[in-house]
Design a protein with these regions (language model features):
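Surface-exposed loop/turn motifs in large extracellular/passenger domains
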Residues: 1-34, 39-66, 71-96, 101-164, ...
Length: 182
């Protein structure tokens, strides 16, 4: 499920897209693929995109892959900034959750992205209403790019994350920074 896309041979920004998924009153939503606010496979930024996933205390949302606010894919180049992911209620994300991911080439950024995950509080402290099957990142740079992952934020309550949590995660080569992340 995708809010906006710039294809591989195009140039331009993917911005201001919103994906909203809501399960009401004993309902269940199952999505067999990924959910993203905006994906840029060309030349340009992915910014100000949002994903909102919510459910009531008697319903759930299950995503079989990952959830992210904005992405510059490996075939693209540009910055990923100010994307938001909000997940509340109950359900399971089988893979990772990220506010912004930059896999593009050249010098880039993945900054000021926000992830909020808030599950229902259970009487049993070992039971979580939201399960994340992998990790949670505010913003990340992956692959061979250099750049900044700055001022990203992650907030998680009443939820279980299987792997790790990071505000900013920078795997770029060359001159990189990761600062002021929460």
């Amino acid at each position: 499920m995708l809010g906006g896309l710039v294809g591989g041979n195009a140039s331009g920004d993917v911005s201001l897209n919103t994906v909203t998924i809501k399960a009401n009153n004993s309902g269940r939503v199952d999505i067999s693929n990924y959910v993203a606010g905006g994906v840029n496979q060309g030349i340009g930024d992915a910014g100000n995109n949002s994903v909102s996933i919510s459910s009531s205390d008697t319903s759930e949302v299950n995503i079989q892959k990952y959830v992210l606010g904005g992405l510059v894919d490996a075939s693209g180049s540009g910055s990923v900034h100010r994307n938001t992911v909000d997940i509340s209620g109950s359900g399971k994300i089988a893979s990772y959750v990220a506010g912004g991911v930059n896999k593009g080439s050249g010098k880039a950024a993945s900054s000021e992205n926000i992830v909020n995950i808030s599950g229902f509080q259970s009487a049993n402290p070992k039971v979580y209403s939201i399960e994340i099957g992998a990790y949670v990142l505010g913003g990340s740079i992956e692959g061979g790019v250099a750049g900044e992952t700055n001022k990203n934020k992650v907030s998680i309550t009443n939820s279980h994350v299987t792997q790790y949590i990071a505000g900013g995660y920078n795997q770029g080569a060359g001159q990189v920074s990761a600062s002021e992340n929460e």
